[in-house]
């Protein structure tokens, strides 16, 4: 009898997890891409802020002479050979290109496919939490604190909250 109750309880837990999984997957990957955002309003409004911040950062990394590596991130480029510092600046420029493309994607989502906003927040959670982990796993020599490095600790929980709110239906 206890075995049967255990199987029923396990089945109920799996069923609940499956239902939650399907609900989240339907929000992240809607059957039809449309411009209908169903989540709370705060994540939508905050998404308007993310776009210019992302594009401005991308332009700094693309067009600043040092790509923002020393002037913003406090990486002491003068400690490296010319080839080494040029490589770092080049990698910052490539990062800027990546940020610019994400900024364009965010614009497309905001204009045409608002139903993908929860997925965009999931990407932001993954990106910024991975940045925090990489700071410990592969630390970089800095002459001070990089503003982005400090901001990541605040942005991860913020993006988690915005992600969760983007999944909740707005009434």
Question: Where on the chain are the PLM-derived regions?
Answer:
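Juxtamembrane helix-break-helix junctions at the cytosolic face
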Residues: 103-118
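Hydrophobic alpha-helical membrane segments
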Residues: 119-136
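Non-cytosolic membrane-interface motifs at loop->transmembrane helix junctions
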Residues: 142-154
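Core segments of alpha-helical transmembrane spans in multipass integral membrane proteins
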Residues: 72-107
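N-terminal signal-anchor transmembrane alpha helix
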Residues: 41-64
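Membrane-water interface at the C-terminal end of transmembrane alpha helices
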Residues: 157-171
